Amino acid sequence: MIYREDSRRNTIGVLDLQGGVCEHLEHLERLGIACKRVKEPLDFEGVAGLILPGGESTCLSRLIRIFHLEGCILDAFQKGMKIWGTCAGAILLATGILGERPHLGLIDMDIERNGFGSQLDSFCIEAALPELSADPVPLTFIRAPKIRRVGSDVRILLQLQDYIVAAENDRVLVTVFHPELTPCIVFHKHFVHKCGICCTPEDDLADSDAQWNSRSWMRLAPHV
């Protein structure tokens, strides 16, 4: 494992074991950010922030152990690396999982797997998030978990009815939905800034937004 505290870290890594790896990388590239796949210990070199994509949390946790990455993630985190977990990634980061043992346990919260129901209960909505965007933000929920409790050091970014869907502390960001499956780059931009990295000005992103939309399967998804 190579992750030195004094090394120059200006890259965002995406854990390349399962989930929307390509989609996360595309969003980061649209922001003009240096990014790469992380699949082995040497890949942590130069990584300022790591994204844990969605997928299936139990399978993802097992793959992390098989590839000997759990110690690498925890070591890099202790040395300053930021982490963002989406959907299953958020489950891995929680200190408490209803009915299960926790995995990495890096943010003080309790989470419920499949809190919104089965795959057939997946949906897309828009929500106001004035802290991050002047416009409504599209949210895609796919067999998503629900955050039921957060600790005193955790800030709620977005709450819908009686459950939390986005939260963060100084080092960790969690979203139970999939920002990488919409053209919106609001959450990727927020995470990049959290990692102390500058990105492409928003005015320069209009063309890339249109290009992403034209090839995205999400334009066919039902909206509620």
From Swiss-Prot:
Q: Which branch of life, at top level?
A: Bacteria
What PROSITE patterns does the record point to?
PDXT_SNO_2
Pathway assignment reads:
Cofactor biosynthesis; pyridoxal 5'-phosphate biosynthesis
Reaction equations catalysed: aldehydo-D-ribose 5-phosphate + D-glyceraldehyde 3-phosphate + L-glutamine = pyridoxal 5'-phosphate + L-glutamate + phosphate + 3 H2O + H(+); L-glutamine + H2O = L-glutamate + NH4(+)
For the keyword Transferase, the answer is no
Pfam annotation, one family: SNO
Binding positions for L-glutamine? G55, E56, S57, R113, I142, R143
Gene Ontology MF, one: pyridoxal 5'-phosphate synthase (glutamine hydrolysing) activity
What's a GO biological-process term for it?
Answer: pyridoxine metabolic process
The protein's UniProt keywords, in alphabetical order, are: Glutamine amidotransferase, Hydrolase, Lyase, Pyridoxal phosphate
Name the GO cellular-component terms: cytosol; glutaminase complex
The record's EC number reads 4.3.3.6, 3.5.1.2
> Could you name the active-site residues?
C87 (nucleophile), H178 (charge relay system), E180 (charge relay system)
InterPro entries attached to this UniProt entry: Class_I_gatase-like (IPR029062), PdxT/SNO (IPR002161)
The protein's assembly and partners: In the presence of PdxS, forms a dodecamer of heterodimers. Only shows activity in the heterodimer.
The Swiss-Prot or TrEMBL record describes its family as follows: Belongs to the glutaminase PdxT/SNO family.
Functional summary from the UniProt entry: Catalyzes the hydrolysis of glutamine to glutamate and ammonia as part of the biosynthesis of pyridoxal 5'-phosphate. The resulting ammonia molecule is channeled to the active site of PdxS.
- Name-wise, this protein is Pyridoxal 5'-phosphate synthase subunit PdxT
Instruction: Record the organism.
Output: Syntrophus aciditrophicus (strain SB)
> Which gene produces this protein?
pdxT
